[in-house]
UniProtKB/Swiss-Prot annotation:
It comes from Oryctolagus cuniculus (Rabbit). GO terms for biological process: adenylate cyclase-activating G protein-coupled receptor signaling pathway; inflammatory response; intestine smooth muscle contraction; negative regulation of gastric acid secretion; phospholipase C-activating G protein-coupled receptor signaling pathway; positive regulation of cytosolic calcium ion concentration. Residues 367-390 have a biased composition (Basic and acidic residues). This is Prostaglandin E2 receptor EP3 subtype. Keywords: Cell membrane, Disulfide bond, G-protein coupled receptor, Glycoprotein, Membrane, Receptor, Transducer, Transmembrane, Transmembrane helix.
Length: 411
């Protein structure tokens, strides 16, 4: 196995703890906490409250999502509807396990007030941490892609979905995603790529540089291959998710227009389409904000043949190094936001938001109809009262019989 420490037992990049906690992505701890920081060493205030808060927040959200999915899964009679629940449950489990494997290490390093090299002289902890970040980071992205594909098939090809998309197939796909990502993350253990200590010397991740002068050419190209493959795989997962979600939204809008033309519960379908589109767009926004900065900056550093390891000696790169650290922290937020975006906020926030939108739209439409045809104002009033008396359905509640989320989750 290749050496996993960034620079052996040399001095840390930053001798003070950084004040921010990037979730599962950074065991931020450094000692000497007592001496004043030197030039370029001021990394912020020290507080163990950040990793503890992130751990509690992520644990509560993902555990609650798993509980709701478990209860809903047992109630489902249709096997086709269980596929969507399996995807959400697997995503919550992935995020939760990722936090439980890394956050305790973060807190331990915080409390120990020691350098990374002192806690991990062999480099094995660095390898474990980098491998864990890679596995659970890519797994979350590709599980989100699998969910997007599943939704698109349920909406655009309901008959094929009903006959081919079984619960067993869903389990096989999810397990295959996890095993494939694990095999990829093990490449540095086999000598292809490297997990190294990153700026400010408080976390381990994939090396994007060519290594030291003494490293071999094959080793350098192995680092570049592994890092670039990780970035391209992440961008591929985002592209799949975006494409499938946009296709789903387009299909829903087309179906809503068809229902409106046929006068088949057009108001109800309009609410469902709006609610669904808001959630899918929210998913895309969260994934973009959380992952795009990290993946794009990794590719930029690979093409420029640089890495955050140069921050130790080049103080002129502090802005770039700090931006990379922010990008890592944004990526770590994804595992905390996932259960809320996919499940929990669906009933808490989306329905109220859609109610406000449709009430405003109905008022505008009513005014326009009354201006066009005053003689039928009485009929318009009855139609408006009838629409208000209806209960707004949950997300994916009457989209298709093959839709896996056909009714809102009940608590």
């Amino acid at each position: 196995m290749k050496e996993t420490r960034g620079d052996g037992g040399s001095a840390p990049f930053c001798t003070r703890l950084n004040h921010s906690y990037p979730g599962m992505w950074a065991p931020e701890a450094r000692g000497n906490l007592t001496r004043p920081p030197g030039p370029g060493e001021d990394c912020g205030s020290v507080s163990v409250a950040f990793p503890i808060t992130m751990l509690i927040t992520g644990f509560v959200g993902n555990a609650l999502a798993m509980l709701l999915v478990s209860r809903s899964y047992r109630r489902r009679e249709s096997k086709r509807k269980k596929s969507f629940l399996l995807c959400i449950g697997w995503l919550a489990l992935t995020d939760l396990v990722g936090q439980l494997l890394t956050s305790p290490v973060v807190i331990l390093v915080y409390l120990s007030k020691q350098r990374w090299e002192q806690l991990d002289p062999s480099g094995r902890l660095c390898t474990f941490f980098g491998l864990t970040m890679t596995v659970f980071g890519l797994s979350s992205l590709f599980i989100a892609s699998a969910m997007a594909v599943e939704r698109a098939l349920a909406i655009r090809a309901p008959h094929w979905y009903a006959s081919h998309m079984k619960t067993r197939a869903t389990r096989a796909v999810l397990l295959g995603v996890w095993l494939a990502v694990l095999a990829f993350a093990l490449l540095p253990v086999l000598g292809v790529g490297q997990y190294t200590i990153q700026w400010p010397g408080t976390w381990c991740f994939i090396s994007t540089g060519r290594g030291d002068n003494g490293t071999s050419s094959s080793h350098n190209w192995g680092n570049l291959f592994f890092a670039s493959t990780f970035a391209f795989l992440g961008l591929l997962a985002l592209a799949i998710t975006f494409t499938c979600n946009l296709a789903t939204i387009k299909a829903l809008v087309s179906r809503c227009r068809a229902k409106a033309a046929a006068s088949q519960s057009s108001a109800q379908w309009g609410r469902i389409t709006t609610e669904t589109a808001i959630q899918l767009m929210g998913i895309m926004c969260v994934l973009s904000v959380c992952w795009s900065p990290l993946l794009i900056m990794m590719l930029k550093m690979i093409f420029n043949q640089t890495s955050v390891e140069h921050c130790k000696t080049d103080t002129g790169k502090q802005k770039e190094c700090n931006f990379f650290l922010i990008a890592v922290r944004l990526a770590s937020l994804n595992q905390i936001l996932d259960p809320w975006v996919y499940l929990l906020l669906r009933k808490i926030l989306l329905r109220k938001f859609c109610q406000v939108i449709h009430e405003n739209n109905e008022q505008k439409d009513e005014i326009q109809r009354e201006n066009r045809n005053v003689s039928h104002s009485g009929q318009h009033e009855e139609a408006r009262d009838s629409e208000k008396s209806k209960t707004i359905p949950g997300l994916f509640s009457i989209l298709l019989q093959a839709d896996p989320g056909a009714r809102p989750y009940q608590q």
